[in-house]
Amino acid sequence: DEFKVKVIPDNAAKILALRNGEIDAILGSSRLSAEGYTEISQDAAFGHAMDDSTNQTRYLGMNLNKAPFNDPLVREAISYAVNQQELETSVFDGLETAAETLFTNEKPNCGVEVKTYPTDMEKAKQLMKEAGYEDTNDDGILEKDGTSLAIHFNYSQSLASVDNAVLSIAASLKELGFDVTIDAVDMNTWYGALMAGEYDLTF
């Protein structure tokens, strides 16, 4: 017996290949978008299974060695600004739930009480003001010491559903007053930048 692995980067193309009989299975939740999984799971022609137990948590990575993320007030503001409920329902189609800790409380020794950050844009804006950022020219972008709050937000485009998640997060940051440039790169480029510390914000 043998099996062949076929790499199909595009999410829609994967589903089409499955429907056309070109492939027999799609393996891994990171390789299929939430809407793609929902589409397949609702089709009686296909079987599907999802493991309820996972050690994986998606998180927003900030480079603490660079401004503005070296300021805890800015980091707290971002925590209030990002709409986790929208990510849970609209981006991940209810298949993933918002996490308050790195590991789910269902895991051994992980049921800890932590401070939570419900979505509160007004609170986020107040924290940015406390950190010294203001929109002095009414262009929607915050400034501090004459410098606009511009950041690069990079991510690996090889993982399903991440595109929409990044767009949702970027929209929240723009509402907060960030000038966000999104950089979608391949996995190797993303990982190399991460290890070298050559990033502002990553997902």
Predicted regions and their residues:
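Short loop/turn segments at beta->alpha junctions
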Residues: 9-10, 32, 83, 120, ...
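Periplasmic binding protein-like
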Residues: 18, 174-203
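Extracellular/periplasmic solute-recognition and catalytic clefts
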Residues: 4-66, 89, 201
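Sec/Tat-exported extracytoplasmic proteins
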Residues: 22, 27-30, 41-44, 64-66, ...
